[in-house]
C-alpha cells in the first residue's frame, strides 16, 4: 500500500479506537461497582451489555493491530529498527487486549451461574471474582504500557522525519513519555485516583488531531527522503 493509504488507515484507526473506547466507558459505567459482590450482581442484570462490551474489546484489539502495521509502514523509512520496535509494542498491546474478554467472560460466568451450581455470592466465588477483577486491571495497565512505549517511538519518528506538524508531534512525544512514566507507577500501586484519569488527557489532545490530520492531509515524506 502507498504512504497515503497507510496514513488514511492510521487516521481512521486512531479515531475509531477512541470512539470505541468511549463507547466501552459508557457501557461499563452501568456495571461498575467498587465491591465485587455488587459488580457481579450488576453484570447479572446487564449480561447483554457485558457481551457487547466483550465484542467491542475484540474490535479495539484488531484496531490496535491495524494501527500498528499502518504506523510501521509510515515510519519505517525514517528508522526501520525503531519502527519495528514500535510495531512490536503496539502488536503486544493488541494481543493483551484479546485476553481481556476472557477475564470478563470468567466474571460473567460467576455472575450468572448455571442452574444447580453455586451462587455468585458464595465466599469462593467472591474470592475468584476478586482475583479476576485485579487480573483484568493488571492486564489493562500492562497493555497500556506497551501502548505508551509504542506511541513514544512512533511519535518520535514522526517528529524526526517531519512527517506531521512539529508542534503536534511534540505533543505526542510529551503525552507518550508522561504515560511511560506514570503507568508503571500505577501498576505498582504508587499512583491512583484522579491522576490515572488526568494523565490520559494529553494523549487525547494528540491522537484526535493526529487522526484528523492523517485522514485529511496524510504524511509528508521522511525528512531524509526529501529533496534538499
Task: Locate each region found by the language model.
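Hydrophobic, aromatic-enriched alpha-helical segments typical of multi-pass transmembrane helices
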Residues: 1-228
Amino acid at each position: 500500500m502507498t504512504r497515503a493509504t497507510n496514513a488514511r488507515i492510521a487516521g481512521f484507526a486512531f479515531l475509531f479506537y477512541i470512539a470505541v473506547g468511549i463507547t466501552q466507558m459508557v457501557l461499563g459505567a452501568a456495571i461498575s461497582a467498587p465491591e465485587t459482590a455488587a459488580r457481579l450482581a450488576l453484570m447479572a442484570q446487564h449480561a447483554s451489555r457485558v457481551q457487547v462490551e466483550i465484542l467491542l474489546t475484540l474490535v479495539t484489539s484488531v484496531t490496535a493491530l491495524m494501527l500498528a502495521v499502518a504506523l510501521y509502514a509510515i515510519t519505517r523509512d525514517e528508522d526501520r529498527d525503531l519502527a519495528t520496535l514500535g510495531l512490536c509494542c503496539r502488536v503486544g498491546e493488541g494481543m493483551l487486549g484479546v485476553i481481556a474478554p476472557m477475564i470478563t467472560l470468567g466474571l460473567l460466568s460467576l455472575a450468572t451461574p448455571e442452574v444447580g451450581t453455586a451462587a455468585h455470592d458464595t465466599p469462593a466465588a467472591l474470592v475468584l471474582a476478586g482475583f479476576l477483577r485485579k487480573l483484568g486491571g493488571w492486564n489493562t495497565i500492562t497493555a497500556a504500557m506497551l501502548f505508551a512505549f509504542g506511541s513514544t517511538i512512533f511519535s518520535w519518528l514522526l517528529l524526526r522525519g517531519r512527517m506531521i506538524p512539529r508542534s503536534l508531534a511534540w505533543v505526542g512525544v510529551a503525552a507518550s513519555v508522561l504515560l511511560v512514566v506514570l503507568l508503571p507507577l500505577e501498576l505498582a500501586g504508587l499512583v491512583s485516583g484522579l491522576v490515572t484519569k488526568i494523565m490520559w488527557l494529553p494523549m487525547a489532545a494528540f491522537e484526535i488531531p493526529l487522526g484528523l490530520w492523517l485522514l485529511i492531509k496524510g504524511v509528508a515524506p521522511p525528512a531524509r527522503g526529501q529533496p534538499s
